[in-house]
Amino acid sequence: MEYRQLGNSGLRVSVLTMGTMTFGGKGNFAEVGNLQLDEVRKLIDIVADAGVNLIDTANVYSGGGSEELIGEAMGHKRKPGMLIATKARYPMGEGPNDRGLSRWHLIRECEASLKRLKTDVIDLYQVHQWDGLTPLEETMEALDSLVRSG
């Protein structure tokens, strides 16, 4: 497998990444796939054996179901060198603050993602899309706070 430097992060990631939008099959995501735990475990083993070292997911995929399946499949023990990337932005509830890139939403969703993934570390936490309602400074400060808190 070929690996490349991820910006200035110090991380080297495989040129292929395992996308997980098809995990869980809940809500609108049922249209693109409905992989369940046994299949997810097999896929993680296959990509890890091929040298893929980055699993990409998002809190919104199957309403958190994708992250839950990854957490169940890997348990509290990740494969050596496997990195996890997840994202936040889209609605995760009906409340007015259950969406967007506000500090409140990002920190709350990061904590929820950690629980669903059954891990204490997210290697790459990303914004899923621009949020024109939240000042960029607030978003960047929230992300910086998450990095500093570990």
Q: Which functions belong to the PLM regions below?
A:
Residues 56, 67, 87, 120-123:
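Acidic active-site catalytic centers that drive phospho-/nucleotidyl reactions
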Residues 1-82, 148:
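N-terminal binding-site loop/beta-alpha segment at the start of enzyme catalytic domains
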Residues 74, 88, 143-146:
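Hydrophobic positions in alpha-helices of CheY-like receiver
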Residues 21, 58-60, 87-91, 127-130:
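Active-site beta-loop-alpha junctions enriched in small/polar residues
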Residues 61-65, 86, 104-106:
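A short linear-motif detector with a strong N-terminal bias
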Residues 77-101:
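Structural motif corresponding to the early beta-alpha repeats
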Residues 27, 32, 93-150:
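Glycine/proline-rich, positively charged
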